[in-house]
Amino acid sequence: MFRQSRWDEPLIFELGNKGRKGFIVPEPEEEVKRKVGGIRIPEKILRKKPPNLPEVSEVEVIRHYTRLTEMSYGVDNGPVPLGSCTMKYNPRIAWEISNDYRINMLHPLQDERTIQGLLEILYELQKWLANITGMDYCSLHPAAGAHGEFSGILIIRKYHELKKQLDRKSEIIIPDSAHGTNPASASMGGFKVVEVPSGEDGNIDMEALKSVVGESTAGLMITNPSTLGLFEENVVEISKIIHGVDGLLYYDGANLNGIMGYTRPGDMGFDIAHINIHKTFGAPHGGGGPGAGPVCVKDKLIDEERNIWLRDLLPGYRVVYDEKTGLYKLVNNEKYSIGLLKAFFGNIVPLIWGYTYILMLGSKGLRTVTEQAVLNTNYFISLVKDIRGYDIPYGKDRYRKHEVVLSAKPLYDDTGVSAEDVAKGLLDAGFYAPTIYFPLIVHEALMTEFTESETIEYIEKYAERLQEISTIAYSDPEKAKEWPLNTSVRRVDNVRANHPKTLAPTWRIYMEKVCRKYSEC
């Protein structure tokens, strides 16, 4: 029986009392004072009033966050089968290495000669990611997946700008099964988004694609395998069509876990690809990061006369090895690069996780990762495809790659029990829910992804719970609409929780809204 803790726990800012301390900074020794001249901060840079931080003891902090973890759920508690998120186990050895003081105490403004070990790690990671994706050069600069996408879009923009054709290259084509960040990234990059529909088989409708490709096409963004878990079989032909109008093909690496070691985006004809280190390569993610979204490119010549290559457009810094000096260096083509998109080199900690993950597994191990992930998903399909109330659009007997999208539309039509109700029913039994209502082309969608980390036994239990939910929905639908009862938080008012007037992602925003509402603080 699953029962989650339910604490009436205030926010950390609401805890504590004036004068309470968790840590007292010791006075420096006399010898230290003599050498550095004391540790007093100059008055001219002191705050005029103390920061608005809670004054709490160490034990209060420990108890507070322990209670919060008891009311939460993550990959350490159990599988998190969120589709297109690749929530795999985060190896502890990678945590140990990334937390080593020889890494986390480095400063980005240190002399390059003093961080040669770190630069060597980043240099090797660049090469490995280029090899895995079939690209030629990588920048580790972008901070996350959508950041990597935006980098790729800016590279496409710069490419056409350097070729003096940006005035007419105004459109980015995106399939209707794409991640929502794709059209957002393209729009932020100044392009018009042109949506192309999926065909009856779930892949891109080739005739529809041909009808929208033209002289205004700047590029196409695609995830392969798609959010439906289907491999885009026409990808080589798509590449030829886009390149035929001097467009660039962009690979969203969110679903790389479904093909890693078997095929590579570069071999399919892609010019640019981003990689989610926090998905495919075992770094933690969720709660806003930190993630890492390296972007890689083929070594495509842009302008022979000026000797400009696609690699010159990469953001931030790349690490290169100088054979003459035997040193690793950070380089950036300031003249043609799309520039810095964040401070310094990138999010180093998740990059160290990714480096460790690849180093541990090797090429054979990475291939096995994909094999196991694909096998897990297809085993799950075999268990649920005939359960009453669920459908698998685009062919329930077709093999998928890393994930599958179930539809609870038959269940909803028959009983009124929705995909959201199904998700709540899973939560009520201690299972994490899949991604729901996405992709938009599947009604009452339940996008489910079991990574290589999961066991047969757990997948079977998950399928059994989906069967139980179906049985209850058809016999007592009102009961199904009451879930969850066993979780820390029960049903919430979705509209109120997401409304701009009530949404407060931070304490400061919350206090500002309280002040405005009650005209006092």
Swiss-Prot record:
It is an enzyme of class 1 (oxidoreductase). GO terms for cellular component: cytosol; glycine cleavage complex. It catalyses: N(6)-[(R)-lipoyl]-L-lysyl-[glycine-cleavage complex H protein] + glycine + H(+) = N(6)-[(R)-S(8)-aminomethyldihydrolipoyl]-L-lysyl-[glycine-cleavage complex H protein] + CO2. Keywords: Oxidoreductase, Pyridoxal phosphate. Its EC number is 1.4.4.2. The modification N6-(pyridoxal phosphate)lysine is found at K279. GO terms for molecular function: glycine binding; glycine dehydrogenase (decarboxylating) activity; pyridoxal phosphate binding. GO terms for biological process: glycine decarboxylation via glycine cleavage system. Pfam families: GcvP2_C, GDC-P. Its cofactor is pyridoxal 5'-phosphate. The glycine cleavage system is composed of four proteins: P, T, L and H. In this organism, the P 'protein' is a heterodimer of two subunits. The glycine cleavage system catalyzes the degradation of glycine. The P protein binds the alpha-amino group of glycine through its pyridoxal phosphate cofactor; CO(2) is released and the remaining methylamine moiety is then transferred to the lipoamide cofactor of the H protein. Belongs to the GcvP family. C-terminal subunit subfamily. This is Probable glycine dehydrogenase (decarboxylating) subunit 2. It comes from Staphylothermus marinus (strain ATCC 43588 / DSM 3639 / JCM 9404 / F1). The lineage of its organism: Archaea, Thermoproteota, Thermoprotei, Desulfurococcales, Desulfurococcaceae. The gene is gcvPB.
